């Protein structure tokens, strides 16, 4: 590609509204342009990268035995009513009606559509296993789109759906897709981790996320120092302490704490260890509890894991905190002074709190706390659950090593849906005995456009993007110095361009009438892995200059050897 016939669209300055590095560099490198909130046009440079991600994903998913299809972005609302997700998805599911007042949605995912297709097209176990996928535009009406294409309303996604006659078949399909994901991300040159995850709104049982490791990641992942165990912070189990509860050494006393509204203030003002405090949080209860709200009790230095909490049968899902008015009406005190002693509402205790003794907690009276509280003496220990998020140094749930935490960007997710959708939509086939059997489903997604942004988050420097070679918009750049003043420079550049393109290499030939400094900055910004600089001075000595973007190195290469040198770099 010649830059004179190409839309380069690079920017010198970083736009003010770009918060993360990938958003900044995608704008500056001329990859995307904002159309509206969460909506982006992909310019030629960005589209080249997007297509490379798509092609790698397509090849590996094909190799896993999946078959490509293409489904509509517009879906009938009635399909979503069949599974009950029409309300579960909330306002992120964009609804509209056509001219005949028929309700539709813009697709954020396609479980309903694919299940409807399979129940009409597949009728025998002999047609299984079946795995269908598409690479298609999706739409999710995000409340707060941010970070460019990382959290956009419209995005490109690969979504696949497997159908099997039994759970054993589902496990095989799931494992095949897991391995295909690993091969795809390996080929892309990304540092990533597959981690155990919560199934969320998609539903089902087994679930793993694939995270690209990056400091800007919105998710925390926990992994063992001594094994392959890794889990999203939402899923990582906090084991019960190995120590037994110590015997009481203090009597329970009531202490005036008028200025201690938070755990931090209580610790600072009264000189107690934060590990000896508990905090009591109130959330809306589910129908399984004979109360409107329920208390969740965790250690003062721990954080409530909201996903773990809302997965409990006693807690309303999605999680909803009780408001101040409810607390005062039911308990007579406000947040900051609440605790389990004398509480006439149900409560659940975290594992770490269950082994505490001589601890401090709110007295359910404004401005007062109990010190020296002990279970089964001052308050009965009730239901115990894992309520907290893990912290660095916790024992790994696998029994090997301790947990470390890193930030990650979720780029893929695989689910064992089981019969959650197929049963709701009556998707079954005749088995070997001639009986109707509801199909076991798997669901698999890769955020193709998000992969592009996450690769940049992981691969950049002060000059711009440093693409993994498999994703770069161009593999080689040719920069002829003062080409329009030197016939031999132009001739050498044209010859090299023809040779490399004939070999199937993506080449950007910078034939602009620009200063060399401008050319070099653009090529570094775009992140082209290999650059060949052609100039009169080097040609006088029979050489070209070769630059490697990732190594940030320069070499002088004989003109006769330049093609072989580039081939060696690419092999």
From Swiss-Prot:
Keywords: Aminoacyl-tRNA synthetase, ATP-binding, Cytoplasm, Ligase, Nucleotide-binding, Protein biosynthesis
Localization in the cell: Cytoplasm
Self-association and partners: Homodimer.
Membrane found in the keyword field: no
Domain of life: Bacteria
Domains (record comment): Consists of three domains: the N-terminal catalytic domain, the editing domain and the C-terminal anticodon-binding domain.
MF (Gene Ontology): aminoacyl-tRNA deacylase activity; ATP binding; proline-tRNA ligase activity
Name under which the protein is recorded: Proline--tRNA ligase
Top enzyme category: ligase
């Amino acid at each position: 590609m010649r830059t004179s016939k190409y839309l380069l669209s690079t920017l010198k300055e970083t736009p003010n509204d770009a918060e993360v590095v990938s958003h900044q560099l995608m704008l500056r490198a001329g990859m995307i342009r904002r159309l509206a909130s969460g909506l982006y046009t992909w310019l030629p440079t960005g589209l080249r990268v997007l297509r490379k991600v798509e092609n790698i994903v397509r090849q590996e998913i094909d190799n896993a035995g999946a078959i490509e299809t293409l489904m509509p972005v517009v879906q009938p609302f009635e399909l979503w009513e069949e599974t009950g997700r029409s309300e579960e998805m909330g306002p992120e599911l964009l609804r509209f009606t056509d001219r005949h007042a028929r309700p539709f949605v813009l697709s954020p995912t396609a479980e309903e559509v694919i299940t409807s297709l399979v129940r009409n097209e597949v009728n025998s176990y002999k047609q299984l296993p079946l795995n269908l996928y598409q690479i298609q535009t999706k739409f999710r009406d995000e409340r707060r789109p941010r970070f460019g294409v990382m959290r956009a309303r419209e995005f490109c996604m690969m979504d696949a759906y497997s159908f099997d006659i039994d759970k054993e078949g589902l496990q095989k399909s799931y494992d095949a897709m897991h391995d295909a994901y690993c091969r795809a991300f390996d080929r892309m040159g990304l540092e990533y981790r597959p981690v155990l995850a919560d199934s969320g709104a998609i539903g089902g049982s087994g679930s793993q996320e694939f995270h690209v490791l990056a400091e800007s990641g919105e998710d925390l992942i926990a992994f063992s120092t001594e094994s392959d165990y890794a889990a999203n912070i939402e899923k990582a189990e906090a084991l019960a302490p190995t120590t037994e509860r110590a015997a009481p050494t203090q009597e329970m006393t009531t202490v005036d704490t008028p200025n201690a509204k938070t755990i931090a203030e209580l610790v600072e003002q009264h000189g107690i260890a934060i590990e000896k405090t508990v905090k009591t949080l109130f959330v809306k209860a589910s129908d399984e509890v004979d109360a409107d709200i329920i208390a969740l009790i965790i250690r003062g230095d721990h954080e409530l894991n909201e996903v773990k909490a809302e997965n409990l049968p006693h807690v309303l899902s999605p999680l909803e905190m009780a408001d101040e008015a409810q607390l005062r009406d039911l308990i007579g005190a406000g947040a900051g002074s609440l605790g389990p002693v004398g509480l006439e509402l149900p409560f659940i205790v975290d594992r770490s709190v269950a082994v505490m003794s001589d601890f401090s907690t709110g007295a359910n009276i404004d401005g007062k706390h109990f010190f020296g509280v002990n279970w089964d003496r001052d308050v009965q220990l009730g239901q115990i659950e894992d309520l907290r998020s893990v912290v660095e140094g916790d024992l790994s749930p696998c029994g090997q090593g301790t947990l470390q935490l890193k930030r990650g960007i979720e780029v893929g997710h695989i689910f064992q849906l089981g019969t959650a959708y197929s049963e709701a939509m009556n998707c079954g086939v005749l088995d070997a005995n001639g009986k109707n059997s509801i199909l076991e489903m798997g669901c698999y997604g890769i955020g193709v456009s998000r992969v592009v942004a996450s690769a940049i988050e992981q691969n950049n420097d002060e000059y711009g993007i440093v693409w993994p070679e498999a994703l770069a918009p161009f593999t080689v750049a040719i920069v002829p110095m003062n080409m329009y003043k030197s016939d031999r420079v132009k001739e050498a550049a044209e010859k090299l361009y023809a040779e490399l393109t004939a070999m199937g290499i993506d080449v950007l030939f910078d034939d602009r009438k620009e200063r060399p400094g401008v050319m070099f900055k653009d090529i570094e910004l775009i992140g082209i892995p290999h650059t060949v600089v052609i100039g009169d001075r080097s040609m006088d000595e029979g050489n070209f200059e070769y630059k490697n973007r990732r190594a940030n190195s320069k070499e002088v290469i004989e003109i006769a050897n330049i093609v072989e040198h580039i081939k060696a770099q690419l092999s």
